[in-house]
């Protein structure tokens, strides 16, 4: 017997609305089925940019392998950002960039910027360093060299290696190499619509 929406419990109405939203998303996806060859080219480009399983396996071997890979560094950076501790990897990256400085005239300016941002007492992104390392790094600011942050960088690397890196390995970072979803061909689109309609019918029948 057909019942009006007013007769349905609130939970059922919510479920029906949720399913309506999902169905709308599926319908939008079906519109993409008519894309031309240009869409196929985009999918090939996207596929080629995926990280290989071999590369990701190396990430689990060591933190060094992870952060010396562009995509690995980006993934680890995003993970640390989600934990509100991205200052550690940002400091490490800044030190790596600093060591590549070729102009002696720029050393002092770049060193001071890194120090003020990550090491000084009033640093906006202060990293966790022991007092001895912090004091030694502060002393190095008197005559900055390419190695003036080496000890501090090593300490932060070790901190990440023993702490956040281990948590990263337990995170769903392997999703980066999960198989791409099947293309939205005619059959796939039909199955998607059928699945949505079946789910919608189940919700209504349960609420009746």
From Swiss-Prot:
Palmitoylated on Cys-2 and/or Cys-12. The lineage of its organism: Eukaryota, Metazoa, Chordata, Craniata, Vertebrata. It holds the Pfam family RGS. It comes from the Eukaryota. Keywords: Lipoprotein, Palmitate, Phosphoprotein, Signal transduction inhibitor. A lipid is attached at residues 2, 12, 95 (S-palmitoyl cysteine). CDD domains: RGS_RGS4. Expressed in the developing nervous system. The gene is RGS4. This is Regulator of G-protein signaling 4. It comes from Gallus gallus (Chicken).
């Amino acid at each position: 017997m057909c019942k009006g929406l007013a007769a349905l419990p609130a939970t059922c109405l919510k479920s029906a609305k949720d399913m309506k939203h999902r169905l709308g998303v599926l319908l939008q996806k079906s519109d993409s089925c008519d894309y031309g060859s240009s869409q196929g080219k985009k999918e090939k480009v996207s596929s080629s940019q995926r990280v290989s399983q071999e590369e990701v396996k190396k990430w689990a071997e060591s933190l060094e392998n992870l952060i010396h890979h562009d995509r690995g560094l980006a993934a680890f950076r995003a993970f640390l950002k989600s934990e509100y501790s991205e200052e550690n990897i940002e400091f490490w990256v800044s030190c790596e960039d600093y060591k590549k400085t070729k102009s002696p005239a720029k050393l002092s300016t770049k060193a001071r910027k890194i120090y003020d941002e990550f090491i000084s007492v009033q640093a906006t992104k202060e990293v966790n360093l022991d007092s001895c390392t912090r004091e030694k790094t502060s002393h190095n600011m008197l005559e900055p060299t390419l190695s003036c942050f080496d000890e501090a960088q090593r300490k932060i690397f070790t901190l990440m290696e023993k702490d956040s890196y281990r948590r990263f390995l337990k995170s769903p970072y392997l999703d980066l190499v999960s198989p791409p979803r099947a293309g939205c061909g005619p059959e796939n689109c039909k199955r998607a619509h059928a699945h949505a309609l079946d789910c919608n019918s189940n919700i209504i029948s349960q609420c009746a």
